[in-house]
């Protein structure tokens, strides 16, 4: 179930302030954030945001196609190593 339309999209204030200051100064620094829940706004386009995945900060370059999605969608938290190999061949 998605967020109510009357509430509008959510962005953490500290993240929005950092992006606004970068836009005013035309600076392209990497912004570190732990806010995976923040929605990507059009103001974020062209910036690189390092999103925390529980272990390290994953750099995510924001493009126009990402607007409206959450930051956490682009920094996976789980690493899939694949299923174990079939041991039937080695038992013979």
Curated annotation (Swiss-Prot):
Q: Name one GO cellular component term.
A: cytoplasm
Q: Name one GO molecular function term.
A: structural constituent of ribosome
- Keyword RNA-binding tagged: yes
One GO biological process this protein is involved in is: ribosomal small subunit assembly
Q: Which Pfam families match?
A: Ribosomal_S19
Organism superkingdom: Bacteria
Key word rRNA-binding present: yes
Which keywords does the record carry? Answer: Ribonucleoprotein, Ribosomal protein, RNA-binding, rRNA-binding
What is the purpose of this protein?
Answer: Protein S19 forms a complex with S13 that binds strongly to the 16S ribosomal RNA.
The record's similarity note reads: Belongs to the universal ribosomal protein uS19 family.
Protein's name according to its UniProt entry: Small ribosomal subunit protein uS19
Organism the protein comes from: Halalkalibacterium halodurans (strain ATCC BAA-125 / DSM 18197 / FERM 7344 / JCM 9153 / C-125)
Taxonomic lineage of this organism?
A: Bacteria, Bacillati, Bacillota, Bacilli, Bacillales
Q: Which gene encodes it?
A: rpsS
